[in-house]
Regions:
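Selective transmembrane helix interface/packing segments
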Residues: 1-232
Length: 232
């Protein structure tokens, strides 16, 4: 007789990084719902306090970064970059909670890379037109077609593997410190967590989001035209 797999069996059979991804996604969704409820009651004439100040700082900073790289069309790209930044930073620092960082799994980072790659291609096709976009692969000479294709296809792997390697290395080093030093790790662990989880996690989030914005910017036409508005 076949044994019916329960949700508990399914969940425990998942890898630690996938379990962390599920847990953090649920937590972020709950936090977003709570913040959304708070924002519904917030009036723009009110003096910002608490989480509102943090949100204004975060969204304002990402908007400024996107605007400096992309220009006028930044308004439709910034929400994706903001969502990406929040998930990446929370995932990168999840080691502070004793979790396996989701970004220490190549499946997670490559998925993020493929998502970004899809948006990059959609942006190029939407802004340039399908024929003009495809023509770009044979410029300045058709002989460059293989090189251009390889460079384009390498984008999600470049983004995903860079993030994966940096976060995994930090997790491995922290694991070695705890296994070798035992209780003595409590002396050096705070400083190492500060570097590998917080500092390195922030830097990798910044690098991923900056590269994402730059790749998207590279698909936009040179003219200073907000093509998102003209195509709505």
């Amino acid at each position: 007789m076949m044994k019916v797999m329960t949700f508990r069996d399914f969940y425990t059979n998942l890898s630690p990084s996938i379990r962390s991804t599920i847990f953090l996604t649920i937590v972020l969704l709950i936090v977003i719902i709570i913040i959304s409820k708070k924002l519904d009651k917030y009036k723009y004439t009110d003096t910002p306090t608490g989480i509102i100040i943090i949100l204004e700082w975060l969204i304002g900073g990402i908007n400024d970064m996107c605007k400096s790289i992309i220009g006028r069309p930044y308004r439709k790209i910034a929400p994706y970059v903001t969502t990406l930044a929040i998930f990446l930073f929370v995932a990168n620092i999840s080691g502070l909670l004793g979790l396996t960082p989701p970004t220490a799994s190549v499946s997670c980072t490559l998925t993020l890379g493929i998502m970004t790659f899809t948006i990059i291609q959609m942006t190029g096709i939407r802004s340039q037109g399908i024929l003009s976009y495809l023509k770009g692969f044979v410029d300045p000479n058709p002989i460059f077609l293989p090189i251009n294709l390889i460079g384009e296809i390498a984008t999600p792997f470049s983004l995903g593997l860079r993030l994966f390697g940096n976060i995994l290395s930090g997790s491995v080093i922290m694991g070695l410190v705890y296994s070798v030093m035992g209780f003595g790790a409590i002396v050096v662990a705070p400083a190492l967590h500060g570097y590998f989880d917080i500092f390195s996690g922030f830097i990798q989030t910044l690098v991923f989001c900056t590269l994402t914005t730059m790749f998207i910017s590279g698909k936009l036409p040179d003219e200073e035209v907000d093509y998102f508005d003209t195509h709505e």
